Amino acid sequence: MIAIARQNRVRISPQKARLVCQLIKNKSVIEAQNILVNTDKKGARIILKLLNSVIANATNNHAMLAEKLYVYEVVANQGPTLKRNLPRAKGSADMIRKRSTNFVIKLSDDKNERKHEVEAIKTRLKKRVLGQNKRKQSVSGEKK
């Protein structure tokens, strides 16, 4: 089972946020919290709040045990960018880009979750390929 929490349009650059995301990927929840508490970055505070939120989601909504949870996936995608002008010499202007980030954190209680997901994708692809081969055979059979 996977528990998810999202936070959109957070005023931090995605590039800076991804540095913190890489620190906690595939770690246990307790270990991830310790890492974030001891990391002196703006992104660490934001991700720690979101991590606590997804832990609450997992325990209250999905009846998972907090001790068994681990960070399945952490994503920091680019959100909308605010564009501002900075006046320069001779009537020109430079663009200031105030970037924002969309965060997604997924927690799982099953260490083999990723293996099951990969196997499911492989079986879907096999079925799709087999279906295409059957269509090709039926089409080629009609033309003869």
Curated annotation (Swiss-Prot):
Residues 124-137 have a biased composition (Basic residues). Pfam families: Ribosomal_L22 (PF00237). It comes from the Bacteria. Gene3D superfamilies: Ribosomal protein L22/L17. Keywords: Ribonucleoprotein, Ribosomal protein, RNA-binding, rRNA-binding. One of its GO terms (molecular function) is structural constituent of ribosome. One of its GO terms (cellular component) is cytosolic large ribosomal subunit. CDD domains: Ribosomal_L22. The keyword Ribonucleoprotein applies. The keyword Cytoplasm does not apply. Residues 124-144 are annotated as: Disordered. One of its GO terms (biological process) is translation. NCBIfam families: rplV_bact. Part of the 50S ribosomal subunit. This protein binds specifically to 23S rRNA; its binding is stimulated by other ribosomal proteins, e.g. L4, L17, and L20. It is important during the early stages of 50S assembly. It makes multiple contacts with different domains of the 23S rRNA in the assembled 50S subunit and ribosome. The globular domain of the protein is located near the polypeptide exit tunnel on the outside of the subunit, while an extended beta-hairpin is found that lines the wall of the exit tunnel in the center of the 70S ribosome. Belongs to the universal ribosomal protein uL22 family. HAMAP family: Ribosomal_uL22_B (MF_01331_B). This is Large ribosomal subunit protein uL22. The lineage of its organism: Bacteria, Bacillati, Mycoplasmatota, Mycoplasmoidales, Mycoplasmoidaceae. The gene is rplV.
